[in-house]
């Protein structure tokens, strides 16, 4: 589960390497974000020459979480790290490449561009 002050790895080539969660979108009392949820975050580490800089406030969608997620068939999926992909206001990714696997649950939330860019969908 991702909440305020959670640090996530960035799984794209937008220039950010690590982000810190400011807010979970989707209601005033919403505390946790899971796979496919949108968060507002600030960039804590960035690569030189990237599109985003350290200190920028960005929107991101969570693509991997350490906490396990239950699927409809009864199976569970979890990852080794918490990761997100930076998105624009129209839900399209800021970067042109996605690193690492992403969860199949993104398909339910209409993130087809992220699914198509990902090297592996679990």
UniProtKB/Swiss-Prot annotation:
Keyword check for Ribosomal protein: yes
Tell me the GO BP annotations in alphabetical order: translation
Could you tell me which Pfam families the record lists for this protein? Ribosomal_L14 (PF00238)
- A cellular component term, taken from the record's GO annotations: cytosolic large ribosomal subunit
Q: Which Gene Ontology molecular-function terms are recorded?
A: large ribosomal subunit rRNA binding; structural constituent of ribosome
UniProt keywords (A-Z) are: Ribonucleoprotein, Ribosomal protein, RNA-binding, rRNA-binding
Keyword rRNA-binding assigned to the entry: answer is yes
**Could you tell me which InterPro entries the record lists for this protein?**
Ribosomal_uL14, Ribosomal_uL14_bac-type, Ribosomal_uL14_CS, Ribosomal_uL14_sf
User: What function does the entry list?
Assistant: Binds to 23S rRNA. Forms part of two intersubunit bridges in the 70S ribosome.
Its family remark reads: Belongs to the universal ribosomal protein uL14 family.
Q: How does it assemble?
A: Part of the 50S ribosomal subunit. Forms a cluster with proteins L3 and L19. In the 70S ribosome, L14 and L19 interact and together make contacts with the 16S rRNA in bridges B5 and B8.
Task: Fetch the PANTHER family from UniProt.
Answer: 50S/60S RIBOSOMAL PROTEIN L14/L23 (PTHR11761), LARGE RIBOSOMAL SUBUNIT PROTEIN UL14M (PTHR11761:SF3)
Protein's name in the database: Large ribosomal subunit protein uL14
What organism does the UniProt record list as the source?
Levilactobacillus brevis (strain ATCC 367 / BCRC 12310 / CIP 105137 / JCM 1170 / LMG 11437 / NCIMB 947 / NCTC 947)
């Amino acid at each position: 589960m991702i909440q305020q002050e959670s640090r996530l790895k960035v799984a794209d080539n937008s220039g950010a390497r690590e982000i810190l969660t400011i807010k979970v979108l989707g209601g005033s009392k919403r505390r946790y974000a899971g796979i496919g949820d949108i968060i507002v975050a600030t960039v804590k580490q960035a690569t030189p020459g990237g599109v985003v800089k350290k200190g920028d406030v960005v929107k991101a969608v969570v693509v991997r979480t350490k906490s396990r997620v239950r699927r409809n068939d009864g199976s569970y999926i979890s990852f080794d790290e918490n990761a997100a992909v930076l998105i624009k206001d129209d839900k399209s990714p800021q970067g042109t490449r996605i690193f690492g696997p992403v969860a199949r649950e993104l398909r339910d939330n209409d993130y087809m561009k992220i699914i198509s860019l990902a090297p592996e969908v679990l």
